[in-house]
């Protein structure tokens, strides 16, 4: 099965590069020469039956007729990968993108509102529906990840608010415990990897700045995103993921494509493309 998994991992690497090259502000392409201009976020383009796949809580999109399935499970970062991934795998697999704003799959934790401390029942309902799919999976490929530092440790871009009014907590105490959340996710990986191949996508850089809204067309040449800032946000989850082991667990490291330890910089753009926006 490795002969199948490794091409999928290669495709993911390529899609991470190209799908995070996104321009969304109308008119910006007239000021900066950008070949990959598009009028809306990538996750809005994948549709079925005249409805976007992103944000569906029921009737999840399903492309292809193969018995072999790829299930993409995550948030808007994964929603941006779904569009091209569908085209690249649908001839050999049934592709099921389950992508929701701020979604991270945990089985034994509760999601609460940090404003009201109330349990988010809609998350539980969505999770139950997803469990009916993945708990019966056998010899599928399940791709997991997203803004994992946020979901596991409440960390996001250095110096910026979270923009997420929720928190995963222990199901019994309804209190946050990083160990409880880690154990939940580790058990999920162990359970799913008994019968499936799991691709775990490590954190992607989040720069915390919209280079278009800030009108950086004159400053873009000198804009720097430091690798040390990325690590301050994500080192904890990287170390945690490094410690998860399974013979059917395969790992993808997007930050290694963009970040250079020696220069302490992560590339945000080249002469023609932005790699990501915020």
Tell me the role of every PLM-derived stretch.
Residues 1-278:
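Extracellular/periplasmic envelope-modification machinery, especially enzymes
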